[in-house]
UniProtKB/Swiss-Prot annotation:
Listed transmembrane segments: 20-41, 371-393, 426-450, 463-483, 496-519, 520-536, 541-563, 598-619
Residues making up the signal peptide according to the UniProt record: none
GO CC annotation, single: centrosome
SS bonds (residue pairs): C259-C266
Positions with a binding annotation for Mg(2+): Q355
Name by which UniProt lists this protein: GPI-anchor transamidase component GPAA1
Gene3D superfamilies documented for this protein: Zn peptidases
Species: Mus musculus (Mouse)
């Protein structure tokens, strides 16, 4: 306390902070980026290991030999699904009853806020079919789920056939201690969400559905299966769920263990695992996989049916069969054995998966980065905002500091005069107008879509996207509006106070986002922090304005799409990137209203108004 109360010591501290602030900010930002890039290199990346004792060994004998039966079921399912987009409910009921399951159906309907042009649907109605295999050795207190999504674009026939063949095989075993639910959902994720809401007796997305007539125990784990052919060259696992949630790492370890036992090739993000981590090639390949995971997790989308289970505290994975040009191929029997082994191990669980990590990054299936090792990367970036805020606070408490002299230290003999206060009224206008623009960006595109279609020759989805872009660009005129209301006798102190508030606001937002979804928080911090630190109404304003625009949330999304496709080795042209950007905007809004994805409200109600504050600072008059 003596350091802050003594004027001489406080003046010395102010000199140090003002003199070293810029070098410390640069060093902190570089350290944050370097720390993130180093996550794919040992020792920051560690080998995965099984933490749950009940799943620590693969000493189970898989007996599934129903590959031919699975193919027969798949052919029958495809034959009965003659009408595109229609699920053969009656055939599924008969087939599930024939293998000894309790069979139930659930109808659901959903009117989307605007037409989904990607899947060509607006008024959605469908029927889910599920069968329950009751555990012969216990009461129905716990259960496992094997689910297959069926959408209008792909029938997923082989996955349905394998599900029915596994149900027939499981029915003949007596060692099950948990109920097993075999679920076939209509309309992909919409059917999955409808079933989950009905199973847990809640309604969070507005889907109208019939109540479930049959239930099993509390769901402990779930596996979603997607197969496009009778043979696969590899199984790709997807872990990223809604709003960046991840399943317990032990479930992923279990999948990898049984793939290795059965000789199945398993991939992550479509990438093979690096074999040599001692050379530079292995970590660099792991860095590509890690970046792909970061980009997918940051989107907040449910990248498979498993992503919706995670919201309900159910550990889940989505497995996709890949049939490429590789020489070695595996049939449905091999895939079925891996699934049988996983379910038999999950059957041993005495409690929910909780021993291993829930927050991690994956440079490979056999390597992970824990939360304690990746969070410092974001911490270094947020330190830049804290240092700049401290610098502004000290400048505001020094009398007679001009913007040109902000970086200069005062002479030792200069007394500290009473501080000229900056009234909160001078900051109220830009803060309120910025937040009002965020509210308009959040509400108007969906509310005004019908009005836009009446006056302009556009479809509803196009109207939503164009309204989004129009409101976003209209925010650039914000400084001209706020300056008419701001009346400060000391204009330099006005923009410094506004920037101080904006820096604290941005740091709090990014810190909270990073705790919930590290990937999103890091990407936003890596892009927004430099422009936020440099924004001021003096100096090369054109350069600062260009930097602010390039690092705005919308342009960050645009650039992330190019980076994502580049990492997938499917580069985009500028026209293709723009079209994909418009589609991503529409899907982001749609997934918020349909599934509760939070990326759109975070950007519209939080980061966009904050970005407008820095834009206001830049053009302060």
């Amino acid at each position: 306390m003596g350091l802050l109360s003594d004027p001489v010591r406080r003046r010395a501290l102010a000199r140090i902070v003002l003199r070293l602030n810029t070098p410390l900010c640069v060093l902190s930002y570089v350290a944050g980026i370097a720390w993130f890039l180093a996550l794919a290199f040992p020792p920051l990346t560690q080998r995965t290991y099984m933490s749950e004792n009940a799943m620590g060994s693969t000493m189970v004998e898989e007996q599934f030999v129903g590959g031919d039966r699975a193919r027969s079921f798949a052919r029958d399912f495809a034959a009965h699904r003659k009408k595109p987009g229609a699920l053969p409910v009656a055939w599924l009921e008969r087939s599930m009853r024939s293998v000894g399951l309790e069979v139930y159906t659930q109808s659901f309907s959903r009117k989307l806020p605007f037409p989904d042009e990607t899947h060509e649907r607006y008024m959605v109605s469908g029927t889910n079919v599920y069968g329950i295999l009751r555990a012969p050795r216990s009461a129905s207190t716990e259960s496992l789920v094997l689910t297959v999504p069926c959408g209008p674009d792909a029938t997923n026939s082989q996955a349905v056939g394998l599900l029915l063949a596994l149900a027939a095989h499981f029915r003949g075993q007596i060692y099950w201690a948990k109920d097993i639910i075999f679920l076939v959902t209509d309309h992909d994720l919409l059917g999955t969400e409808a079933w989950l809401e009905a199973y847990h007796d809640i309604n969070v997305t507005g889907i109208q559905s019939s109540p479930l007539q049959g239930r099993a125990g509390a769901i402990q784990a779930a596996v979603a299966l997607e197969l496009s052919s009778d043979v696969v060259t590899s199984l790709d696992v997807t872990v990223e769920g809604l709003n960046g949630q991840l399943p317990n790492l032990d479930l992923l370890n279990l999948f990898q263990t049984f793939c290795q036992k059965g000789g199945l090739l398993c991939t992550l993000q479509g990438k093979l695992q690096p074999q040599d981590w001692t050379s530079l090639e292995g970590p660099l390949q792991g860095l590509q996989t890690l970046l792909l995971m970061v980009l997918r997790q940051a989107s907040g989308r449910p990248h498979g049916p498993h992503g919706l289970f995670l919201r309900y505290g159910v550990e889940a994975l989505t497995l996709r069969g890949i049939n490429s040009f590789r020489q070695y191929k595996y049939d449905l029997a091999t895939v079925g054995k891996a699934l049988e082994g996983m379910f038999r191990k999950l059957n041993h669980l005495l409690e929910r998966l909780h021993q291993s990590f829930f927050f991690y990054l994956l440079p490979a299936l056999s390597r992970f980065v824990s939360i304690g090792l990746y969070m410092p990367a974001t911490g270094f970036l947020l330190l830049v905002l804290g240092l700049k805020a401290l610098e502004l606070w000290m400048q505001l408490h020094q009398a007679g500091v001009n913007p040109e002299e902000a970086g200069k230290a005062p002479s030792p003999g200069t007394p500290l005069l009473p501080t000229q206060g900056v009234g909160l009224a001078s900051l109220t206008a830009p803060l309120l107008i910025s937040q009002a623009m965020g509210l308009a960006l959040y509400f108007l595109p969906v509310l005004g879509q019908h009005l836009a279609t009446q006056h302009f020759p556009v479809a509803e989805a196009e109207a939503v996207v164009l309204t989004l872009l129009a409101i976003y660009v209209a925010g650039l005129a914000l400084p001209h509006n706020t300056h008419r209301v701001v009346n400060s006798q000391v204009p330099d102190r006005g923009w410094m106070a506004l920037k101080l508030v904006a820096l604290i606001y941005l740091a709090l937002q990014l810190g909270c986002i990073a705790l919930l979804n590290f990937s999103l928080g890091f990407l936003l911090a890596a892009t927004m922090v430099p422009a936020a630190a440099l924004a001021k109404p003096h100096g090369p304003r054109t350069l600062y304005a260009a930097l602010l625009v390039v690092t705005s949330p919308a342009v960050t999304l645009f650039g992330s799409l190019f980076l994502w496709r580049e990492l997938l080795e499917v580069p985009l042209s500028l026209a293709e990137g723009w079209q994909l950007f418009l589609t991503a905007l529409a899907q982001g809004v749609l997934e918020h209203y349909t599934y509760g994805a939070l990326l759109f409200p975070i950007l519209a109600l939080g980061l966009y108004p904050c970005w407008l504050l820095f834009w206001n600072v830049l053009f302060w008059k």
